Amino acid sequence: LPPNLVECFYDITNADRKEWFCTSDPKDRKLGSGGGTAWLLKECIENDSDNQQADWQQNLPSWLAAEKRILLHAGGQSRRLPSYAPSGKVLTPIPIFRWGRGQKLTQNLLSLQLPLYNRIMQKAPSSLHTLIASGDVYIRASKPLQEIPEADVVCYGLWVDPELAKNHGVFVSRRDNPERLDFMLQKPSVAELGKLMRDYLFLMDIGIWLLSDRAVELLVKHSVKADGSIGFYDMYTDFGKALGDHPSIIDEELNSLSVAILPLPGGEFHHYGTSREMISSTLAVQNSVIDQREIMHLKVKPHPSIFVQNTKVEYKLTPDNQEVWIENSHVGSKWQLHSKNIITGVPENDWELNIADGVCIDVVPIGESDFVARPYGFNDMFRGDITDDN
């Protein structure tokens, strides 16, 4: 998790400390998804251990074998989704689905992710104890899960067009053996995928990986440096590209791991990585069921891409207000909103504001009575030189 969320996570979510453990990456170095996995395992093993001086790597095999666990990577800085950077994207509040039953007004990205991950773990063979997933996606499976084969690594993917696959990791399998990984690519070009389609099938990586204890131990081994510290190691480019029948990275130990690739039945992939994706993904989820007999929420919004949660809005929204997200805020009658506006955390006010297209406002409480306003642009990336206007 982000460092500021670790200590208050249990209070915010009412999570049981016996069921949940959270930590953040060290502040002095970047670890990547592989190194971050090793760090999370190390921190959790040491937290569980009565002997803090014990070697966590020696305890790793027995600890892994003890029970099944879900590892969720949600520690990003959320630079492209500033509205939920303080709490982490994984706690982004998600509007109830107009077609959904059993929804909660307090639901967030984390609570929506877990049911699928739990179903997968219940279905997984007894040899697979570890599931690793990303914290900034919502993945749905509208159909029952297939049987999960015995393998050191089992990865789920989606059938997608090359145009979408080019932005993600891709599992490539031979047409005569579609469940067996031949090799993995990272962000391949459309032309590259086009050349493969005669003899190969490809699935987009959706970030759900099941690992055997042996696979986890090798992932950790490659993440730990000679001095015993954990360094940068990427699970997808470094570890993933060493998997399959014809891997691009030659490593005898990793090359020997057996790998199975499964298409997620009725799968949907919704990314919550940016401000735009937060709205577009939520809209896509709302529209995943269009049968009016299944839709229980009968109110028609001025525009489908308007989302209002836990908010007092005295300003009249219109069809011109497109890609608008208002949460935990007071928007008074003297406000004027346009499009691509994200308003979060605004306290009760009597302000007269004209929020231009693409302007977003987040307000963070400081101490008992103070607030800090954080204006930003809808498409701001918050990267590069601080003096750069972009």
Q: Where would I find each of the regions flagged by the language model?
A:
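N-terminal glycine-rich phosphate-binding loop and ensuing alpha1 helix
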Residues: 1-129, 133, 138-146, 386
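Short, functional N-terminal and low-complexity linear motifs
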Residues: 6-10, 76, 182-187, 246-250
